[in-house]
Amino acid sequence: MDRPAHAPRGVRGAPRSGRRPLLQLGNLTAGLVIFAATYVLIAVQRLPFVHLNRPAAGLLGAVAMVAAGVLTPAQAYAAIDLDVIVFLLGLMLIVGYLEVGHFFEWAAQSVLRRVQTPARLMAAVVIGGGLLSALFVNDTVCLVVTPVLLVALSAVRVRPTPYLLGLAMGSNVGSALSVTGNPQNMLVGIWSGSSFGGFLIHMLPVAAGGLAITYAALRWIFRTELSGRFPERLEMATVDIDRPLVFKGLAMFGVAVIGWLAGWSLPGVAIAAGALMVLIAQRDPAYAIDRVEWSLLLFFASLFVVMRGFQATGAVDWIDHRAIALIDGQSRWGLAWGVSGVMATLSNLISNVPAVMLWRTTVPQLPDPVLAWRVVAMSSTFAGNLLLIGSVANLIVAERAEGRGIRIGFWEYARVGIPVTILTIVWGVVALVVFG
């Protein structure tokens, strides 16, 4: 991370009293109650008589912050970080066209056809999923690759669960490599002021070692099932890839990477590349636009408003002071262990994106904010492997598998996820402190 992080722009402290709130609640109490209720709904999602997903819970919280008078509409609009939204949108447009062209299915099949033993298939799934996720967002990779993997495994009649866990965990770990790997990395990349290349260089040993550890752990835990050779050859129907469209998509992504490596604006390059892709694709834009995760953009925008309302209560200042007091005077090792422990815990309580947002103003005030941002990116990502509900990628794999009659149990996942998470976070801290 090449230049010092900066605190976000915006108001601090409670809003002035000249407003007429729709709900007669004290701003302090209302802000705290709305924030807590929103994060409970995000974490739990299912309560008696309440069925809300994360974007819906975030939207309700954002609207409640304005309705209760915690924020004015103008303050709510100003709270939304358009750099993050624009960056996500531009990347999603390019990825959407690659999906339309069946690039991800083709890439998955190209790898799977070359393996002949269970152990090599596991390595291909973990490493291949990780590398794809480092570039094209782990959620998308899991969404597209899971059905391809299940079809391949059904042909050789082996239990698919170990490989599904390998895909989910490998995708999570590999996504730590770059700012395009997952949503929380995008937040860290923009807020920390890191360049694309700087982030990549510092996270390379973290992600590479993490993938090796993940494979080794899975190889050991499922050593009986991963021994020998497949009873039959992996056979899959050929994917009808749209070569011109895929070439254009990969070319535009390559142009974007060159722009990022040159130090140009992350969101500016992303949205320009996405817009150019719409222009040159020569396909109905609706196909790609339909694949944009609008619900994720809504979730981010809503969380920005909720967090600004929480900030207006003064609670963020209290958290900042407590965190600084806890870590102040610590060595780089102490800071890294402290931040990784907090982020791993928060990421499994309230999800990794809200956890990173919660620490947006805290990290720049820590003794070594550059190291702290890297640890936040690493630990919030690796913590997604702890439990089945730890990341959206995990849930996508589980839901896709369940649609084909394969259920991944909570404890079945946890017995693998817990050791993988502990080992990879320990490695991540060591790598960032020693090589950073």
Name every feature range the model reports, one short phrase each.
Residues 21-96, 205-209, 215-318, 416-436:
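Hydrophobic transmembrane alpha-helices of multi-pass small-molecule transporters
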Residues 54, 58, 92, 122-126, ...:
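Alpha-helical transmembrane segments of multi-pass membrane proteins, especially transporters
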